[in-house]
Amino acid sequence: MSPSADGMSASGPRLLLINPRFPESFWSFRWALREVLPGKRAVNPPLGLATLAALCPPHWHVEIVDENIESVPLRPRADLIGVCGMGVQFSRQTELLAYYRKVGYRVVAGGSYVSLCPELYESCADTVVAGEAEHIWPQFCRDFERGRPQALYRETGTV
C-alpha cells in the first residue's frame, strides 16, 4: 500500500523499519553462522530498530524487517519507511532509500553512519535522523503526524 494523500493510514501511521543486508565481509558474520553457530540465521539482531519501534506512539503500527534474515517487501503496506545502517551497509542502505522514495514512499535514514555524515543521505531520503534516537525520534514522530517532518533531525545532547 502506498501512502494515503495525507501520508498516514486511517488507524495510525504504518512504519516499516529495515535493517539492510550486510555485504559479504567480516561484518556479515556469515563465517560465524557457519562455523560457530550452525543452524542460526543471525548473530546481531537490529536492536536499534527495536528501540525506534518502542519510541513510537502506541497507535503507530511498526514492522521490522532484517534483510539479513528475510527479503524486503517491494510494495509494503506503509506510510513511512525507515532504513538504518552502519558504514558497511551504506551502499545497500542508500539503494533501498532511493528505491522506496522513487516508488512514492516517504523515507527516513538513520543509524551510526548517517550520524557521522548526514550530508551523504540528503539526496536519497526525505528525512535524515543524525544522533541518538532516544533524544530525537519522538519529535520526528510528532512532526510526521502533524504533516511537517523536517529534512534533518540532529541530536545535540549527550547520552
Regions found by a protein language model. Give the residues of each.
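Short, charged N-terminal beta->alpha structural module
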Residues: 32-58
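Glycine-rich beta-alpha loop elements in corrinoid/cobalamin-binding modules
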Residues: 48-159
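Non-catalytic N-terminal targeting/anchoring module and adjacent flexible stem/linker
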Residues: 1-10
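Short glycine-rich His-centered loop
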Residues: 13-41
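A short, charged/proline- and glycine-enriched loop
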Residues: 9-13, 77
